């Protein structure tokens, strides 16, 4: 049986820090970010289905979100201001991401490739799936800003403002629900969020 380096590569996502140009009170790596995006994307899909008549596969959405930044293990996490400096750079970076995604897919043993390719290659996502993952990705970046600001790090003030504009552009009923029900707790301390649920 031929060896595959696929999961050895993915395990290195924990070595890639996000927000590399920003001073962070607590660093965040791509692996933990991907887990949070998967949880939030799953919640958005579940909310969409349960509250707003949606019909999406919440478990698939969670898997797509889990792998949404997998190519960064080969490309690194390019800071957003650089990635979107102009349309030419954004277009070239998309092409690089596509190559990295394909390289990852090619690492998977052939008998399993049809399972992993649709998770890694974002071109296999439906528009609705892509929208939910992007909403979750932006929400998690926004939550990171809230956490940094709550810790007194004003470095994230402009990022928060930019992300509020992004969230407004991607706004949906399920996002509004999530923002109203879950986000306010991110402004609270551990003691405050633990008061109602003692062990």
UniProtKB/Swiss-Prot annotation:
It is found in: Cytoplasm. It catalyses: a 2'-deoxyribonucleoside 5'-phosphate + H2O = a 2'-deoxyribonucleoside + phosphate. Keywords: Cytoplasm, Hydrolase, Metal-binding, Nucleotide-binding. Its main location: cytoplasm. SUPFAM superfamilies: HD-domain/PDEase-like. A divalent metal cation binds at residues 33, 68-69, 137. GO terms for cellular component: cytoplasm. It is an enzyme of class 3 (hydrolase). It holds the Pfam family YfbR-like. Substrate binds at residues 18-19, 33, 69, 77-80, 137. The keyword Calcium does not apply. Residues 30-142 form the HD domain. Its EC number is 3.1.3.89. Its cofactor is a divalent metal cation. It comes from the Bacteria. One of its GO terms (molecular function) is metal ion binding. The record marks 18 as: Appears to be important in orienting the phosphate for catalysis. Belongs to the 5DNU family. Homodimer. Catalyzes the strictly specific dephosphorylation of 2'-deoxyribonucleoside 5'-monophosphates. This is 5'-deoxynucleotidase YfbR. The lineage of its organism: Bacteria, Pseudomonadati, Pseudomonadota, Gammaproteobacteria, Enterobacterales. The gene is yfbR.
């Amino acid at each position: 049986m031929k060896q595959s380096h696929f999961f050895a590569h993915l395990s290195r996502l924990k070595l890639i820090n996000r927000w590399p140009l920003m001073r962070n009170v607590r660093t965040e790596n791509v692996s933990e970010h991907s887990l949070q995006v998967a949880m939030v994307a799953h919640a958005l899909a579940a909310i969409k289905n349960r509250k707003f008549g949606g019909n999406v596969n919440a478990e698939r959405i969670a898997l797509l979100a889990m792998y949404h930044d997998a190519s960064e293990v080969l490309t690194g996490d390019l800071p957003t201001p650089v990635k979107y400096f102009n349309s030419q750079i954004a277009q070239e970076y998309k092409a690089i991401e596509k190559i990295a995604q394909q390289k990852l897919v090619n690492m998977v043993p052939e008998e399993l490739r049809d399972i992993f390719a649709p998770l890694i290659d974002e071109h296999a996502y439906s528009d609705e799936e892509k929208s939910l993952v992007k909403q979750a990705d932006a929400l998690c970046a926004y939550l990171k800003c809230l956490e940094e600001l709550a810790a007194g790090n004003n470095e994230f003030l402009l990022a928060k403002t930019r992300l509020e504009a992004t969230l407004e552009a991607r706004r949906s009923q399920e996002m509004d629900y999530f923002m109203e029900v879950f986000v306010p707790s991110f402004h609270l301390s551990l003691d405050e969020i633990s008061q109602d649920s003692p062990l």
